[in-house]
């Protein structure tokens, strides 16, 4: 009951009784009241240190055979479980902004349409937990030995996997919408009361409760083969082969799945009031590389090092050389220089994973003080399957001057 201005904020009638805080609002226009909103301190609900369980296993073994071949084995596994991690009872209804609540709907006591800005559950309700689990596993074994020429060889295989699972509680947009319309709950006849939270049953609260359940798996397998030694001409060298396979998978529950258009825009939101969700994906790639490096002391003063790497990627190939020289001009001065090219592939996440992040926006007054509270918005972060590797050319010239045993100056 009462008379209110257009755009005037009206707080929950039981705000203070349910441990809420009255927050005066700025006037929407000269001569109009901004009203008051009901907020609450949710920061003290979070843990500075969560209750966690940690476990780890490490095994290592080395042995030598009669033929001079050595065998190495390493295994490591870790598991971290976050057991509690309490959150806010619910989050701001970002997916429900701008929807008018008609008179008599969802317990509205007003005789005209209003806009509801709030959370499904406020300060009077307990905090749901957001458990996390992070597991890492790595196994590696290899052989090494010496050839008849005196050069050494080694081969290693490494397989690793990281699995990250979490659940972040939220509210279902579709079920919350149905409950507000009076067709919620298991029976399809229950109504959510936006204006008296104590009128909502535990069963109806469970009905609208949802969340983002996500599992991310990153795995990598690498096979390395290397030969090192010195030629008859006094050239130190290393050459080898590397084969690599990596994968990146993201699994989501249905509520947290979003759909993106070709331009990266969100064409279908997740079924969550606050969290934006994202895409599921399952992607992998292979690469094979060969490389060689050689070093030669051309004279007592000049050392030359050259290297090259050719790598065949899933969709393209790259060749990257490197050459460097070091010249001892005299006992006090060394000159050096190098030239190389390099590249870096985009990650599988950049190539195939799209998600909706949350960004907090804060407005400020002319004097720099905060104006109002932080507002959250959803921001689409889209993948780009056409990303190309970064490439670079690197040139360096330098000198090392050592005038005495106590002083050394390097310039590059």
Question: Which ranges hold each PLM region?
Answer:
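Surface-exposed, low-complexity loop segments enriched in small/polar and acidic residues
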Residues: 2-52, 58, 68-287, 340-386, ...
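Outer-membrane beta-barrel channels and translocator barrels
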Residues: 52, 64-68, 148-150, 232-234, ...
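Glycine-rich phosphate-binding loop of nucleotide-binding enzymes
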Residues: 61-66, 306
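Charge-patterned, long linear interaction tracts outside catalytic cores
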Residues: 144, 387-412
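Alpha-helix capping and helix-loop boundary segments enriched in small/acidic/polar residues
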Residues: 278-285, 293, 309-314, 324, ...
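Transmembrane beta-strand segments that form the barrel wall of outer-membrane beta-barrel proteins
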Residues: 302-313, 319, 325, 335-339
């Amino acid at each position: 009951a009462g008379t209110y201005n257009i755009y005037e904020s009206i707080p929950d009638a039981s705000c203070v009784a349910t441990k809420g805080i009255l927050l005066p609002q700025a006037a929407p226009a000269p001569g109009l009241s901004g009203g008051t909103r009901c907020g609450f301190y949710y920061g003290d609900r979070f843990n500075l240190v969560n209750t966690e369980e940690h476990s780890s296993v490490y095994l290592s073994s080395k042995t030598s055979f009669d033929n001079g071949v050595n065998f190495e084995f390493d295994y490591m596994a870790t598991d971290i479980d976050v057991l509690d991690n309490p959150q806010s009872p619910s989050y701001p209804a970002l997916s429900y902004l701008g929807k008018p609540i008609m008179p008599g709907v969802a317990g509205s006591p007003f005789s005209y349409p209003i806009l509801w800005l709030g959370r499904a559950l406020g300060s009077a309700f307990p905090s749901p937990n957001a458990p996390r689990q992070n597991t890492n596993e790595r196994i590696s074994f290899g052989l090494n030995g010496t050839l008849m020429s005196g050069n050494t060889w080694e081969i290693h295989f490494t397989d690793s996997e990281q699995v990250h699972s979490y659940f972040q509680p939220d509210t279902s947009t579709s079920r919350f919408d149905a409950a507000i319309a009076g067709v919620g709950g298991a029976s399809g006849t229950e109504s959510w009361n936006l204006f008296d939270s104590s009128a909502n049953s535990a069963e109806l609260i469970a009905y609208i409760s949802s969340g983002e359940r996500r599992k991310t798996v990153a795995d990598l397998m690498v096979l390395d083969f290397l030969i090192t030694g010195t030629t008859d001409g006094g050239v130190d060298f290393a050459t080898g082969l590397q084969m690599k396979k990596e994968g990146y998978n993201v699994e989501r529950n249905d509520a947290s799945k979003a759909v993106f258009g070709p331009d990266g825009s969100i064409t279908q939101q997740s079924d969550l009031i606050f969290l934006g969700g994202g895409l599921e994906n399952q992607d992998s790639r292979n690469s094979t590389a060969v490389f060689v490096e050689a070093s030669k002391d051309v004279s007592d003063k000049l050392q030359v090092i050259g290297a090259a790497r050719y790598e065949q990627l899933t969709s393209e190939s790259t060749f990257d050389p490197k050459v460097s020289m070091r010249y001892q001009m005299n006992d006090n001065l060394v000159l050096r220089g190098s030239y190389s090219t390099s590249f870096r592939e985009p990650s599988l996440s950049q190539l195939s994973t799209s998600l909706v992040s949350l960004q907090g926006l804060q407005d400020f007054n002319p004097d720099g003080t905060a104006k109002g509270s932080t507002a959250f918005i959803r921001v689409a972060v889209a993948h780009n399957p056409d990303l190309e590797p970064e490439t670079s050319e690197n040139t360096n010239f330098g000198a090392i001057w050592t005038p005495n045993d106590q002083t050394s100056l390097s310039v590059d």
